[in-house]
Amino acid sequence: MSGDQGQAGAKRPIRRALISVYDKSGLIDLARGLHEAGVDIVSTGSTAKTIADKGIPVTPVEFVTGFPEVLDGRVKTLHPHIHAGLLADTRKPEHVEALAKLGIAPFDLVVVNLYPFSETVESGASVDECVEQIDIGGPSMVRAAAKNHPSVAVVVEPNGYDGVLAAVRTGGFTLAERKILASLAFRHTAEYDVAVASWMGSTLAPEEPAQKLPAWVGGTWRRAAVLRYGENPHQQAALYRDATAWPGLAQAEQLHGKEMSYNNYTDADAAWRAAFDHEEICVAIIKHANPCGIAISSVSVADAHRKAHECDPLSAFGGVIATNSSVSVEMAETVADIFTEVIVAPAYEPGAVEILSRKKNIRILLAAQPPTTGTELRPISGGLLLQQRDALDADGDDPVNWTLATGEPADPATLANLKFAWRSCRAVKSNAIVVVADGATVGVGMGQVNRVDAARLAVQRAGDRVRGAIAASDAFFPFPDGLETLTEAGVKAIVHPGGSMRDDVVTEAAAKAGISLYLTGARHFAH
């Protein structure tokens, strides 16, 4: 058995503690408990004052260092009399001897939490104010104590104070416990450093304009929930949250229902984004990350849901519903009669949640509007891919910039349907063809490895509704066969990016069919 293993269960008594905290939550109870257990407390600045004001004995750090706070408090603990007491490995006789010669006492416990840098940035504070909240001494003490975990226990959050007092009463922390605390401490400083580095890179020293994506990417995520399983029962899964991110599905409030699954989250995220791709009242129904139906309405959210559901009622069974509008009582009454896994919305009218809750298992989520800009990460073997979010903000996403390749200009109603179809394509896995009528998808061809099969699938799903409808393709038609599949079924107008070396042949096929064909010059692949 190694010495490390042999000491894992041995406790190290806590006789001397260093406390320096910005967040004073629980501080007095902690200090009082330590004092009553006979622990000597050394503390800094406002922390020492807070403790002393309650009549608890405390030694100000300047009494230990023999040096006052300077530079508006920027230098308090950066001193050998502090850091030698933190870094001395008391298992080593030579370290103990060195401390004795210098008249330095070791610390057994360090309790530190850091300046609120991220909160200051989020408050809209000035650059100088944010810089002042970059903690230097705090992380230095935390890292020193965590490195020296064989001799020192370190606690970085108030929710750990009860554990400190329990340890003091029972003889201290074991080595195994100190290792866990050290790991949490380094995680804490890593999160802090990533926040500072990311802010500096984006605010103080941004990349050159030509370099729109950063040379360095840092991020931290904390586990928020352990999920039952992943995409399949044999896969483990968990939900992690980014505390600095725009509040998204990971931060949604669940108002009712069973716990969310991995697949629930992926489908809800796809549905949520699809619904907010449109300015009008919109409902999107998603299954396996693809739309069963998307619809907009100028009448009501219930009308939008009815139209979206009618696109493919069979596939919508067990689907995920999202809307960019408040869920009405009328919509809730309809949804309550349909097997639905998840519904997510920015608001619910009074009574709507109660109606939906008739279904015991339906998951009802309240979520903030998703971001329209930013970047997306996708892990790959050995690294990750980063791209700008496809936000439907290209020039070609505005019908004003479309080119009429052939046929008569579309009337306002047809053009509105073409715009809706084009924006709906973004939510469909490529190759994607969407057939639309009256502000609703009536046929969706998704995820096919060639475009003609996507067109066939969209026509098949639309059935008789395809006659007189319009269609959109997320990428250009490489051959006329996909377009011909749509026109032969009765589609009267089509929008696609264009850009194929055979654009002229495709346009000729459209002209022959007597339809209007628009080119966007933009593309919306989704993989």
Swiss-Prot record:
GO biological process: 'de novo' IMP biosynthetic process
Keyword Zinc: no
Covalent S-S links between cysteines: none
Molecular function per GO: IMP cyclohydrolase activity; phosphoribosylaminoimidazolecarboxamide formyltransferase activity
Catalytic activity: (6R)-10-formyltetrahydrofolate + 5-amino-1-(5-phospho-beta-D-ribosyl)imidazole-4-carboxamide = 5-formamido-1-(5-phospho-D-ribosyl)imidazole-4-carboxamide + (6S)-5,6,7,8-tetrahydrofolate; IMP + H2O = 5-formamido-1-(5-phospho-D-ribosyl)imidazole-4-carboxamide
CDD domains per record: IMPCH (cd01421)
Record pathway: Purine metabolism; IMP biosynthesis via de novo pathway; 5-formamido-1-(5-phospho-D-ribosyl)imidazole-4-carboxamide from 5-amino-1-(5-phospho-D-ribosyl)imidazole-4-carboxamide (10-formyl THF route): step 1/1; Purine metabolism; IMP biosynthesis via de novo pathway; IMP from 5-formamido-1-(5-phospho-D-ribosyl)imidazole-4-carboxamide: step 1/1
Keyword terms of this UniProt record: Hydrolase, Multifunctional enzyme, Purine biosynthesis, Transferase
Sequence ranges assigned to domain MGS-like in this UniProt record: 8-156
Cross-referenced Pfam families: AICARFT_IMPCHas, MGS
Known EC number: 2.1.2.3, 3.5.4.10
Domain commentary: The IMP cyclohydrolase activity resides in the N-terminal region.
Family under the similarity heading: Belongs to the PurH family.
Protein name: Bifunctional purine biosynthesis protein PurH
Gene: purH
